[in-house]
Amino acid sequence: MTPDLPAILTCLRAELPAATLAHLRNPGPSGQDSLLVAPEHLVAVCQFLHDTAELDFDLLSNVTGVDWPEPAKADAVAVPAEGTAPVACGFLEVVYHLYSTTRRLGPLVLRARTVDRVEQVHIPSVVAVYRSAEYQEREIFDLYGVKFAGHPDLRRILMWDEFLDHPMRKDYVAPDDYQYEPTPHDAVLEKTQQYYTAKS
């Protein structure tokens, strides 16, 4: 069942009055509206949605990235129901799909945007709330370049360590003659061992 987004937004504003939130309407055929959350309030919003018994969004099924080099195109796809200032010089967006398995609700779609595509590309990690975000955030970091602050093991997951770019960005140009140089297997094992040793 589709969540009642206006009602959820009302609950969030009552509980987190300082949070910057906006209801984005989807003019497309799916009509799947979403909630735009300022990055600095993302973890608190996720924690509230997860922990509040009346909502109980206990499952994060999917996290994905979107590259918006031209903000006007983003505005055409997701129209703000309330006035929000356009973001200059493009941005990266992270999209979260939440479900309540107990109440059979979902997806509730959350969006968080970086300030730009070059220097201010940080979004807080939600791994502390939803463990299922761990690999998906790594994938977005690898392919889009979003840096998830507080992630327990933020490193490339698909491309090799020495790869310099982010191949899912819309301005990425694939070279036609580069040498594939994967990280040596022993080096990968050593990095993995350091990670698990630090956690234990």
Model region roles, listed by residue range:
Residues M1-S200:
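Terminal low-complexity/charged segments
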